A protein has these predicted regions:
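Coiled-coil-like amphipathic alpha-helices with heptad-repeat character
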Residues: 1-3, 16, 57, 296
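Short alpha-helical segments used as structural interaction elements across diverse proteins
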Residues: 3-5, 18, 85
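Bacterial N-terminal signal peptides
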Residues: 9-20
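PEST-like low-complexity, intrinsically disordered acidic/proline/serine-rich tracts
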Residues: 24-305
């Protein structure tokens, strides 16, 4: 009888421990969030700004062919921003959770930005679909808690831009995202892996601040004829014809071989290639030869044109 009583006591204690175990460190991420601008997320990008992106040669060739006028095509005007880019734009963010009515557990988080689509993050452990499954602007997302951080894996994304200056990612991209809340601030960290256009992972982060007065409005979009151009014309540049690529380099005095260095320009050692007068530690460029003044063309004589 003593053994039976002892067994019952142990069973009861185990049951109490199970019932009274501390809840897993899950943070409430729901709310309306406004983007916080900082030095690493300043809004509109500039032509030829490839600094800080591990672009490979295929990515550089694709970027030099890009023409901003492609956004005026009817097929492009109402395209939503994809999951790899949207957090870098100016759009506000709304997060809410989906709760199982019986267990009261969160089965999915939903993330939606203005000018984007609802992106569910499934928390029920379901597997990602086949690589041949449909790819969408939002992709397919699953999440799990790592301490007090929500880690999200995103696959099945359509090909789209990483930056709105012609830097692209392929449909083979995979994202690892971390959502970290600290009071009224939310850090949104994105790590992008793309075997087609990136030579190594691209890491970017965005800060959001809770905004209780914010409400993301609907975003209806109507396709119109913005530019009168011949049917079938797609704006683009052929190789070697895009003179705007060097604009960023000329504006800020950054050598073009630094701008196009790919992964190398993400690390401090690249300063050795930047002249001291431009904030680096490298040698000054050789002086440019003096420009010869143009000879003034004589005025045409009477009867000449």
């Amino acid at each position: 009888m003593k053994h039976v009583a002892r067994g019952r006591t142990i069973t009861l204690l185990l049951a109490v421990l199970v019932v009274c175990r501390p809840a897993s460190a899950q943070i409430d991420l729901s709310g309306e969030w406004s983007v916080v601008r900082a030095e690493d997320n300043v809004g509109n990008t500039e032509l030829g700004d490839w600094v800080g992106i591990p672009m490979n040669e295929a990515s550089r060739l694709r970027s030099t062919a890009w023409d901003a006028s492609i956004q005026t095509l009817p097929e492009w005007q109402c395209r939503p921003h994809g999951s790899a880019y949207i957090s870098r734009g100016p759009s506000a963010l709304k997060i809410w959770n989906e709760v199982d009515p019986v267990s009261r557990e969160t089965t999915a988080w939903h993330l939606e930005w203005l000018r984007s689509v609802d992106r569910p993050v499934y928390m029920d452990g379901r597997p990602h679909p086949s690589p041949n499954a449909a790819h969408t602007w939002a992709g397919f997302s699953t999440g799990e808690w790592v301490g007090d951080m929500l880690r999200v894996r995103v696959t099945h994304l359509k090909e789209e831009y990483l930056k709105r200056n012609g830097v692209w990612h392929s449909d083979k991209i995979e994202l690892t995202q971390y959502l970290i809340r600290r009071g009224d601030y939310l850090t949104y960290l994105v790590i992008a892996y793309d075997p087609v256009y990136l030579s190594e992972p691209l890491v970017r982060s965005t800060e959001y601040r809770l905004n209780v007065n914010q409400q993301i409005p609907p975003y209806p979009c109507t396709v119109v004829n913005e530019v009168d151009r011949p049917k079938g014309v797609v704006p683009h540049y052929l190789p070697g014809t895009n003179n705007d690529i060097g604009w960023f380099s000329r504006k800020y005095g950054i050598p073009m071989d630094v701008v196009t260095a790919g992964a190398a320009n993400m690390y401090p050692e690249i300063r050795a290639k930047i002249p001291r007068s431009m904030g680096g530690s490298g040698p000054e460029p050789p002086p440019q030869p003096a420009t010869q003044p143009r000879t003034q063309r004589p005025a045409p004589r009477a009867g000449q044109q």
